[in-house]
């Protein structure tokens, strides 16, 4: 009797997963502000990986972000509601970006936590003022991916969530190209959460 454990895996085919779908949760008013492109200066400074445009590979997480973003502050604005933005990015385009990736956020992962603590602890005007992650040669990383932080002071990450942040003009060009393409297969704003 043959068991599945010993069956060979099907052959991997390049191009099967040519497109990576990224999601961003925000409000309708925020999304309208991005219609001509994303402006990094509108991003908060002290996020997990510094100032950047944050996305996820999980639609449910983007929905959560959108609902959190749309809170009681916006109740008086009738024409506003939570939305998620969908970006379809070709993986080959992502490989052209200078990227930093973290798979795990274990308590002992010093590289991950030192970056998060540095970025989360940044405040405008202090010597730690920091826009995002920098390579050894002083260049900005275009993109950073890794777990979502629940409490950076206690080194706790959320299980089952991820984030990919974009930090530079070249990274923005990739996302803005999807927005301004006018093609719904590359970019879409969804309000049916």
Regions from the PLM with identified roles:
Residues 52:
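Acidic, aromatic-lined catalytic clefts of primarily extracellular/periplasmic carbohydrate-active enzymes
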Residues 1-20, 47-49, 63-64, 68-193:
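Conserved NAD+-utilizing ADP-ribose enzyme module
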Residues 20, 24-46:
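Short aromatic-glycine-(Arg/Gly/Cys) micro-motifs in beta-strand/loop hairpins
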